[in-house]
From Swiss-Prot:
Domain of life: Bacteria
Primary enzyme class: hydrolase
Keywords, ordered alphabetically: Aspartyl protease, Cell inner membrane, Cell membrane, Hydrolase, Membrane, Protease, Transmembrane, Transmembrane helix
Catalytic activity: Release of signal peptides from bacterial membrane prolipoproteins. Hydrolyzes -Xaa-Yaa-Zaa-|-(S,diacylglyceryl)Cys-, in which Xaa is hydrophobic (preferably Leu), and Yaa (Ala or Ser) and Zaa (Gly or Ala) have small, neutral side chains
Subcellular location: Cell inner membrane
Topology with respect to the bilayer: Multi-pass membrane protein
Species of origin: Shewanella amazonensis (strain ATCC BAA-1098 / SB2B)
Keyword NADP: no
GO cellular component, one term: plasma membrane
Protein name according to UniProt: Lipoprotein signal peptidase
Record-linked InterPro entries: Peptidase_A8
GO molecular function: aspartic-type endopeptidase activity
Length: 168
């Protein structure tokens, strides 16, 4: 039986819009107000630092010659379409999984727009301790990470409840 959009996980698509807009507006602000590598200290462990990421997480494949832009574009589109199809099939009351999927989609689309528009992703959230810096990231990256963690948690919760059902 097909669920209509109100009964399905598509009801959660507003999260995609919120993540996408927050990500894109924050990146536009950085581009308008920072020079490349400019840094502003906000807290003793946190800066806004404008950097360009030509790769994926942790600058993976950043120096691969340009083809990686299209690979990451295809991956973002593919995952966004796949997760949207899954949302369509999910009941709206599966909160954790629907939230996870929409966070990943919003983040993937935010970084996709950067890749298509600039050829790189704008990163600016810079956490550090003393001289050790975590790689800079953005709101889209954070949404993807949180969504992935929620998917993992959901898979453990689901397998745990499956185990209980088998024992009964």
């Amino acid at each position: 039986m097909q669920l209509n959009w109100k009964e399905s996980g598509l009801r959660w698509y507003w999260v995609v819009v919120v993540v996408f807009l927050a990500d894109q507006l924050s990146k536009q602000w950085v581009l308008a107000n920072f020079d490349l590598y400019e840094s502003v200290k906000l807290l003793p462990f946190f800066n806004f630092t404008y950097v360009r990421n030509y790769g994926a997480a942790f600058s993976f494949l950043h120096d691969a010659g340009g083809w990686q832009r299209w690979l990451f574009t295809a991956v973002a589109v593919g995952f966004s379409v796949l997760l949207t199809i899954w949302l369509r099939k999910q009941p709206a009351n599966m909160v954790r999984l629907n939230l996870a999927y929409t966070l990943v989609i919003g983040g993937a689309l935010g970084n996709l727009i950067d890749r298509l528009q600039h050829g790189f992703v704008v990163d600016f959230l810079d956490f550090y301790w003393n001289t050790a810096h975590y790689p800079a990231f953005n709101i889209a990256d954070a949404a993807i990470f949180i969504g992935a963690v929620l998917i993992i948690i959901d898979s453990f919760k689901a397998s745990s409840s499956d185990d209980k059902a088998i024992k009964e």
